[in-house]
Amino acid sequence: MRVLVVDDDEIFCRLLAEILEGQGVEAAWTTDGLAGYEMASRHHYDVFIIDVRMPLVLGTELAEALKKDHPFAKIILVSAFADETLLNLCERIGFPVLSKPFSARHLLEAVESILANSVKPEGSNSPR
């Protein structure tokens, strides 16, 4: 499984990558939302973990663009500012939110949950 973490906090990116890699997941990361979009166009990722508040592009905007280009993308948003307005927006656009700080267990459960609820495109037996 491949996961892309997009968050403007490099230490947070490295921490999530370490947690995921400890479970045998191939994790890539970037601190730039636009670079994350570019990485997604060049490589296949099973799950995207995206911070909501980043410079240049909001995580919700990046998530919507990724979903448009990759309809079967599995996306989890993360935020230290997960208020009711954000939670309602994310529910409306269909992305789960993890509120920072969260435990490694909650991260892994969120990834497992989003994959368990996934629908594969017709004719797709394996990732690209």
PLM segments and residue spans:
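The short loop immediately C-terminal to the conserved phospho-acceptor aspartate in CheY-like receiver
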Residues: D9, V52-R53
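The feature encodes the CheY-like receiver
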Residues: C13, P55
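Charged docking surfaces used in two-component/phosphorelay signaling
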Residues: R14-G22
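Short hydrophobic/Thr-rich beta-strand motif most characteristic of the beta2 strand and flanking loop
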Residues: G24-T31, M39
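Acidic catalytic/metal-coordinating carboxylates
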Residues: D32-A35, V57-L62
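Active-site beta3 strand of CheY-like receiver
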Residues: H44-I49
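Alpha4 helix (beta4-alpha4-beta5 surface) of REC/receiver domains from two-component response regulators
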Residues: E61, F81-L98, R105, E109
